[in-house]
Amino acid sequence: MRVDSSADPTMSQEQGPGSSTPPSSPTLLDALLQNLYDFGGTEGETEQKKIIKKRENKKRDVMASAALAAEPSPLPGSLIRGQRKSASSFFKELREERHCAPSGTPTGPEILAAAVPPSSLKNNREQVEVVEFHSNKKRKLTPDHNKNTKQANPSVLERDVDTQEFNLEKARLEVHRFGITGYGKGKERILEQERAIMLGAKPPKKSYVNYKVLQEQIKEKKAAKEEEKRLAQETDIFKKKKRKGQEDRKSKKKSAPSILSNGRIGQVGKFKNGTLILSPVDIKKINSSRVAK
């Protein structure tokens, strides 16, 4: 695409050597915008080319802003000349890039990687957290003072328990000894013997008896038990007979109804108009009381 020098006032001003009055800045900006519209208004462009152009324009804007920020502020007299040179160089770059198309557009991550300075990466590396792992084996190698104290404490506790048990045993034996004194002399000796065996003394040997003598002793014991049972039965029979006689007498007394069953003292039946009226129940009571006497 060709750019007319007549349409661009900046180009005409640069070509004309005898131009005495430089144009104002608003007219220069208007001319730049017209050239941009003419340059980007070609027909038959595909959507892909439009996207590529947009990306290129964005990159150029970013680069231009960065260059302007980096450059020192120029003097007020040299502003117009700098604007003219930047406009002419801008159009030249556009033409060159138009003729030789770019091989590939850089992607987003590449642009970000280029924009990020290396100092920030170093800071990120320094901010990485460091985690230390301590194994349990190393801890076991170091002597534990707490364990030694724990091992010493159980021995003290065992001693305390032993003393407590000893005191309880002693108290139990004292109570047992005091209880033995309450019995007679004959039984007291037997209980003392049992107490000595309980404390650890050897029991006395059993007396050996002949087999025939032992059988006779067993028979005598059986006979004594049978006699006791027979006497107990006889006494029970005698007591039962007495109880039966007493119960019979009580039952007879209960069966004989009393004349004073109505609760009135010396009165039988009911008085009505000066006459005593006896019911058949009252007559039966009177007859039964006479028979009982």
From Swiss-Prot:
Single GO cellular component term: nucleolus
Positions of post-translational Phosphothreonine modification: T163
Region (Disordered), start-end ranges: 1-28, 40-82, 94-119, 134-160, 222-266
Modification N6-acetyllysine occurs at: K185
The keyword Acetylation belongs to this UniProt entry's keyword annotation: yes
BP terms from Gene Ontology: ribosomal small subunit biogenesis
Biased amino acid composition, Low complexity: 64-79
Key words, A-Z: Acetylation, Chromosome, Nucleus, Phosphoprotein
Primary localization class, coarse: nucleus
Subunit structure: Part of the small subunit (SSU) processome, composed of more than 70 proteins and the RNA chaperone small nucleolar RNA (snoRNA) U3.
Name this polypeptide is given: 40S small subunit processome assembly factor 1
